[in-house]
Amino acid sequence: MKTENQLSKIKPADRLASVSEYYFSKKLKEVAQMNAEGKDVISLGIGSPDMPPSESTIQTLCDAARNPDGHGYQPYVGIPELRRSFAGWYKKWYGVELDPNTEIQPLIGSKEGILHVTLAFVNPGEQVLVPNPGYPTYTSLSRILGAEVVNYNLKEENGWMPDFDELEKMDMSRVKLMWTNYPNLPTGANATPELYRKLVDFARRKDIVIVNDNPYSFILNEHPISILSIPGAKECCIEFNSMSKSHNMPGWRIGMLASNADFVQWILKVKSNIDSGMFRAMQLAAANALEAGEEWYEGNNKNYRNRRQLAGEIMRELGCTYDENQVGMFLWGKIPDSCADVEKLTERVLHEAHVFITPGFIFSSNGKRYIRISLCCKDDKLAEALKRIKGMR
């Protein structure tokens, strides 16, 4: 048995020094402790849909789980039924033709795809372009894997779009890939065909890979669009998608990526050495969910529209301004000039009103004057959060 002195000599890998524990991992522990103390915190932090998948999706899962032959390892590439359903979904809603056999790779949630893509494309010491503000995992996983993170700015005055004049002036000689995320997290900015055309042109001229993370395109968005709809995009782009947001299945961990056959095969070479596929019943249920019609998305969005109105009232009560044209499942707002520090504001709201709101600084420096409110909370809870905030001293 090792003594305490011996254990003290064991150190973690050096790569852990490049990252810290995920903000929400730490903060939700604090929220849980407050709840355990009877403080009843209303969480408006993370984007975890609180509505269920469709009834037919759940029924398909239950029926398939009863099949005694469905509990073994499944193909690394995903079952054909799921890949065909993803292809049909992209054709129906995005107008994009994908070969289900070679151009689609199901994922255990699109978050793991960040790891797989970085391992497949980026050598230690090479650079990746990451948006500021942006999803923190792009930065943390890049650093863990030895890549050098180079931020590019997204600013409110530019509609939270990349500044291509600024990008053109950057040294791209060591850049391997560029992360984009539209509809955007955390800002709610929506993509346009013009933006995607510029990104594809930029990638082709600079010989880099664009990875577009696209999980929010069905939330409060009348016109879903894929970067792969742009001619030539498959040659230089990878797109992630997820069933977590569009189909209310965050805990199922089912996502996908799409690109050209070579890129998909390189990623599969990594992925097949990391996991052993997904439970067959979940894949069949996901395939069922992808067959949903327009009424499914509209039913979700009716709820989100009501919630966004309440979130807007919370923003105004806090003196924040926001763009009413945002899409996705969050509301992003700018704090008033009279507020010196966004974290002090969100901490005050947490400890006085017992409402958890995300401070924008966690998405990097361009978010330091902003807050984000999740719409993944029922109307009565949002109304109660508003009431509590109005009652703050």
Language model segments and positions:
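PLP-dependent enzyme catalytic core of the Aspartate aminotransferase-like
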Residues: 2, 150, 168, 339, ...
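Active-site phosphate-binding strand-loop segment of PLP-dependent enzymes
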Residues: 150, 154-225
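Helix C-cap/helix->beta junction micro-motif
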Residues: 37, 145, 205-206, 318, ...
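N-terminal small-domain helix-loop-helix segment of the aminotransferase-like
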Residues: 2-109, 116, 290-292, 393
